[in-house]
């Protein structure tokens, strides 16, 4: 039997690495367990870039968490010297009544966030790479930008190690169980015990957290990189924003400036347009018809973007039915287990503040952060299951 720890963290991707950092920063004896190597590309915390924004169309309830996350981006950069965030500005575009535009405006208004509303003519003037229809508008947020996911995970792992956390990679968790006054975790190599367990399973949530009763579906997501027709000059962060663009049919795409030099292009992707999958069966091959569909869609929005196709990569979303997160004490084991899952394709920008929340819950049983929206009871109550009382 290995030594007992204060807290074991299962999963060292975005959320788990942040939890390991915040827990160890508070003096806890932490063991982190990861199925793959550090900063791997098999889950949901890779791909070179993620959008961050405060005018949050999903729900205004997320905004206070984002304000704290932005503070933690800066702290992380100061503590590690790694580039984590580049706030190059962001455009949330589409028809005025689209969720992307109207929801972003709602959050910006409710929380008094700095923003500008642009009509199609002004969008084209400010950002010549973009070609909106005359009836489209955009909310521009100067504080939006991009995150470097691999850098953020590496920074949190670096700090956790510096603070004394023991991190074990290539050691998949087979199962866990309540044990005495805490938990016991079994891997293929050892059995570990701790007073508290934090589970950040990503796309492995259906296996590791089946007993919380939340139906989480895993979705295959594709990221594409194109070399623009005239080169990357007009697409550098100083000239081209991050964007989320919704069409009249509700299809959303999101994309980034060219951030990796003149030869590596710019990244774009559809948002939630993938097939259901599992971590074991996901198709990691990106097919020619998928590349064509992406290029065809973007040719109307950003005509110069789909010049030469460079590469593509897959990742996985873990979606809840309402697309809101699950962050809570485990319903069946509230005294010793904390869970974080179902980030539904929009969670990475919250990584540092989720780590802070998970440390609060594991060490004190509560958090001052507003997380009522993320209670799994909303999805497991009789009404959520379609059962009449």
From Swiss-Prot:
It comes from Streptomyces sp. (strain KB210-8SY). The modification S-8alpha-FAD cysteine is found at residue 315. This is Monomeric sarcosine oxidase. HAMAP family: MSOX. Belongs to the MSOX/MTOX family. MSOX subfamily. The keyword Oxidoreductase applies. It is found in: Cytoplasm. Its main location: cytoplasm. Catalyzes the oxidative demethylation of sarcosine.
């Amino acid at each position: 039997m290995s030594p007992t720890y204060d807290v074991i963290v299962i999963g060292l991707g975005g959320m788990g690495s942040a939890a390991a950092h915040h827990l160890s920063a508070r003096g806890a004896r932490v063991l982190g367990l990861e199925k793959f190597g550090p900063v791997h590309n098999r889950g949901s915390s890779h791909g070179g870039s993620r959008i961050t924004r405060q005018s949050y169309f999903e729900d205004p309830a997320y905004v206070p968490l984002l304000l704290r996350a932005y503070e933690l981006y800066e702290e992380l950069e100061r503590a590690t010297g790694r580039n984590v965030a580049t706030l190059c500005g962001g455009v949330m575009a589409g028809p005025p009544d689209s969720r992307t535009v109207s929801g972003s405006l709602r959050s910006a208004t409710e929380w008094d966030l700095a923003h500008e509303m642009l009509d199609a003519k002004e969008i084209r003037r400010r950002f010549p790479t973009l070609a909106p229809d005359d009836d489209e508008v955009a909310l521009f947020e100067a504080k939006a930008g991009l995150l470097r996911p691999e850098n953020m995970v590496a920074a949190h792992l670096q700090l956790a190690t510096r603070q004394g956390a023991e991190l074990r990679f290539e050691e998949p968790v087979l199962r866990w169980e309540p044990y005495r006054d805490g938990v016991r975790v079994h891997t293929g190599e050892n059995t570990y015990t701790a007073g508290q367990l934090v589970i950040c399973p990503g796309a492995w949530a259906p296996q590791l957290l089946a007993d919380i009763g939340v139906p989480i579906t895993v979705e295959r997501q594709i990221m594409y990189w194109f070399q623009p027709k005239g080169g990357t000059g007009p697409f550098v962060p100083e000239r081209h924003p991050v964007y989320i663009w919704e069409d009249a049919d509700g299809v959303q795409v999101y994309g980034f400036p060219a951030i990796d030099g003149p030869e590596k292009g710019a990244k774009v992707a559809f948002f939630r347009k993938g097939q259901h999958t599992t971590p074991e069966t996901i198709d990691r091959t990106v097919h020619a018809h998928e590349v064509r569909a992406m290029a065809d869609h973007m040719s109307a929005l950003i005509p110069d973007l789909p010049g030469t196709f460079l590469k593509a990569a897959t990742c996985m979303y873990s979606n809840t039915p309402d697309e809101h997160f699950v962050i809570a004490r485990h319903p069946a084991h509230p005294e010793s287990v904390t869970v974080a899952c179902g980030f539904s394709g929009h969670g990475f920008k919250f990584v540092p503040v989720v780590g802070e929340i998970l440390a609060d819950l594991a060490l004190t049983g509560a958090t001052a952060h507003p997380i009522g929206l993320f209670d799994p009871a909303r999805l497991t109550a009789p009404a959520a299951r379609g059962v009449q009382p």
